[in-house]
């Protein structure tokens, strides 16, 4: 199936870089809805690099507890409740561009975690 337009949405990196947190993502999600962008076809809210802790726990990526105190599942649920899709960033290397843990050699466990958080799109 072909789409008439590419996937459209908002990505945290373009404006905020690593300066992201749960409240900001909720505010940007709300703005996509209130400004009519969601209804115009913008469907993704994508959290880019700097969402994770600097070390894995038991092989799992861990959301930064200071930035995302409710966790990614709760944030994904919030995004979905607004009629949007939840996107996240990872990398195919050992580390992301910022030097945080990425998915190389952890692809299956990371995919399961992303799915359990309700992630719809992986950048």
Question: Model regions: which residues?
Answer:
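Aromatic-lined carbohydrate-binding/catalytic grooves of carbohydrate-active enzymes
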Residues: 27-123
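An acidic-aromatic substrate-binding cleft motif
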Residues: 1-17
